[in-house]
């Protein structure tokens, strides 16, 4: 199960460190084993 609070925190941190993150068209979140947990494609 994916913890929404952790994902939100990760997103906030990534936005803080990478200004372009928030405008990224494609984002993939992977766990320790390299499995894709979350894949986001921003609609144009």
Curated annotation (Swiss-Prot):
Top-rank taxon, per record: Archaea
The answer to whether keyword Ribonucleoprotein applies is no
Keyword terms? Metal-binding, Nickel, Oxidoreductase, Selenocysteine
Q: Write out the residues that bind Ni(2+).
A: 20, 23
Its top-level enzyme class, in one word, is oxidoreductase
E.C. no: 1.12.99.-
The yes or no answer to whether the keyword Metal-binding is present is: yes
Question: Any other noteworthy remark?
Answer: The large subunit of Vhu is split into VhuA and VhuU. Each contributes two ligands to the [NiFeSe] center.
Can you name this protein? Answer: F420-non-reducing hydrogenase vhu subunit U
Q: Which organism is it from?
A: Methanococcus maripaludis (strain DSM 14266 / JCM 13030 / NBRC 101832 / S2 / LL)
Q: Which gene encodes it?
A: vhuU
